[in-house]
Amino acid sequence: MLRFECDYGEGAAPAVLELLQKTNFDQTPGYGEDSYCAAAADKIRALCDAPDAAVHFFVGATQANLTVIDAALKPWQGVLCADSGHIHVHETGAVEATGHKCLALPNKNGKITARQIRHAVEEHRANASHEHEVQPGMVYISNPTEVGTLYTKAELTDISAACYELGLYLFVDGARMAYGLMSEANDLTLQDYAALCDVFYLGGTKCGALFGEAVVITNDTLKEDFRYAIKQHGGMLAKGRLLGEQFLALLDEGADVDALFETPEEYLAAVNYIT
């Protein structure tokens, strides 16, 4: 029987299990300070054409989302997102538990627009009582979205420009990014994400790994002391090499990004259809 209710119906890509077994008795430093994590981070930087990017490995997507958002925002700030966005409806208030409100915008097929972002910020700033409200400080989007649609390069470019003009960070949830990258309807590359976003992540848990996400930070302002935030928010794995090894295995699956992750062909067909 084929199961489509979630991305967790199977274990991991065979290459992941093979590498974990092969290196099982290797002795390395903990907490992601090992050579496997370093090598995987280098591979990701190369794929993104972002040699100065900071790459951090997390145990899961919820930890990645709440850590990035809490580390980036000031205590009085919130994050603009679609009202269908994962952080707003499917993470048990994890972001809001850190003290940052999810400022939800009406979605259209899972997406929000640069125009909506500008309107929300301009409306906030025009309010005479704006200092009594939560200040927008970041935009969060998922790509693919929670309903399987894809942002185009033009849409992401417009959102990035709006964020830059308004002084907002742009954060892309890439828990299912591999699905989007392999879609025939996609026109975005990892290099585009690195150029247009302040921070994004490559999902592993939903895309062939047993667990793990790779957060890529391109904005220098967000890089300093970020590991403190990871540890404080429960995102740092003691046996961190397990994360680096899994991404190494996935990244070694092929020479181009289309071959990075193993996913069900039936789901890919659906993603290609729903754009």
Show which residues each predicted segment covers.
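Conserved PLP-enzyme active-site core in the AAT-like
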Residues: 2-275
